[in-house]
Amino acid sequence: MKRSTEEAVRRRRSFFLLASTSGCAALALAWSCSQPTPRSEPPTPPPAPEPSSLSAESLDVLDDEAEISVELEATLDEWFGDLFEPRYVVLPEWREAGFDPNTSPFEGARAFEGIDEADLETIRAGNREHWSSVLNAIDRNANRLPGPWPGRRDLNQTWRDVRLNRNAVGPADFKREARRLFEEDFPTSADTARLYARNCQQCHGMTGAGDGPMSNMMEPRPRDYRHGVFKFSSVSSPARPRRDDLRRTLEHGLPGTQMASWRERLGMGEREALIDRVRWIAIRGEVERWLVASWIADEEPPSEAIEDAYRTIWSRWLTADDYFVALQDDVPPADAASIERGNALFHDATRGNCASCHGDGGRGDGPNAVEVTPDGVRHPLLRDEWGRPAWPRDLRNGVFRGGSRPIDIYRRVHCGVHGTPMPAQGDTLTQDEIWDLVHYVRSIAGLEPE
């Protein structure tokens, strides 16, 4: 199942060059490499070592285990492909159920994960909007048709083939095939890798570690997808986010951060494919961490532990709907009585206990989370899963990264904020009590009742 080492090395280096080198720098590099080396110069040094696809944490833990590191990387490549052409091993039970996550949903093999015909029609509608100028040119039977598009090598090749066949099939068949290509656009895994490199890696990094070249200038820093932990979702643990959760982030961004909306910049099929890409990074990262832990605990080789890890991690994504926190009834009115009850819960150390971190009145300066020195300097006392300072939200400013709708804040209280000290209260507070907290929080944020 693996490519030759030589081919993998060649493709990995070329892809990192694509992602990290500007066009002018690449031309300068190509020109300088084409010039003869003066005889007086020393010999060219050997090429830099091939960058590992393993995380820095794994390499650090396995620093004295070179053979295991090699086996781990080879095992992950066998089950996940690589950064440039990701793929999954299809388990027997998936094949029996007609599920293949490597395919476009329009090929009919993704219903197992909950992508139904209604979802497909939604993608078609979004694609029609995004590709409207192309579809209009097709409908007009224009002589000059749009294309190519950056980062869409596979789409460009298919589009060339369709155009070359234009006269052979006739106008009606050409129009039907051409429209279908764009209405059902869903990038291949390789095209999605290129889309990610063009649009995401500057912040999130090529491996999804949140270490892109822009990341050090950002607060908060970009998400490290490889932990499989996503702060803002509509599910309780141990599930991973639903597609709707990741879709909402791509479409609306995260207020108060540098994560912008991609709704106007990418087509719906492209956004859906990037959801697949983020999921691939997360599942591969979680499996890698599992395999390293298995080796450290029991010296179980990666090649023997992989199937159990793979199946377990995947199940957390496929069963997300089972942990979905749905809105059971209409949102109760945000009247004065509800807000007052929410205020009491917020400050009650035995019930809501929100003020212990968010502070009196929601100022984000609670004694359990922030230490304030006599000269007024604030120091965080809490850390998130990634080891970074966890500052409680100042609720008065009305900026809620996971959304400011009543249901968004309800889910933050019910499910917590995954990967942070913000706990889930769904098992300790009643539904009515959570709504009282929601109404109180929205009132101090100055948000109008909905």
Model-found features: residue ranges?
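C-terminal motif of bacterial Sec signal peptides marking the signal peptidase cleavage site
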Residues: 29-32
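Bacterial signal peptide processing site
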Residues: 34-36
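Extracytoplasmic electron-transfer domains, predominantly the class I c-type cytochrome c fold
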Residues: 46-70, 74, 78-79, 83-84, ...
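Electrostatic cytochrome c docking/interface patches
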Residues: 60-195, 303-349
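Sequence/structural segment immediately N-terminal to covalent heme-attachment motifs in c-type
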Residues: 185-206, 319, 334-363, 367-379, ...
